[in-house]
Amino acid sequence: MKVPIVLMLVLLLIMPLSDGYERKRXXXVECNETCEEFCTYCDDNNAEETENCRTDQTDHSRCVDFYTANNLPT
């Protein structure tokens, strides 16, 4: 019975060191070519609350919404 508890404690200590955990936890956006196009569009058109488009998921989502609202036919 003690082995699973010890194993869980070891895993909890190691997990923050893993690269995948850090990416998930930080919620940072890796800005690829498409992301860069959206962010440049938002910068050029002074979209509000998208200043951190390249690094913040929430700002990036706002930028995509701004882009689609202004560029998709209705």
From Swiss-Prot:
Residues 21-28 form a propeptide. One of its GO terms (cellular component) is extracellular region. This is Turripeptide OL135. Residues 1-20 form the signal peptide. Belongs to the conopeptide P-like superfamily. Keywords: Disulfide bond, Ion channel impairing toxin, Neurotoxin, Secreted, Signal, Toxin. The cysteine framework is IX (C-C-C-C-C-C). Acts as a neurotoxin by inhibiting an ion channel. It is found in: Secreted. One of its GO terms (molecular function) is ion channel regulator activity. It comes from the Eukaryota. Disulfide bonds: none annotated. It comes from Iotyrris olangoensis. Contains 3 disulfide bonds. Expressed by the venom duct.
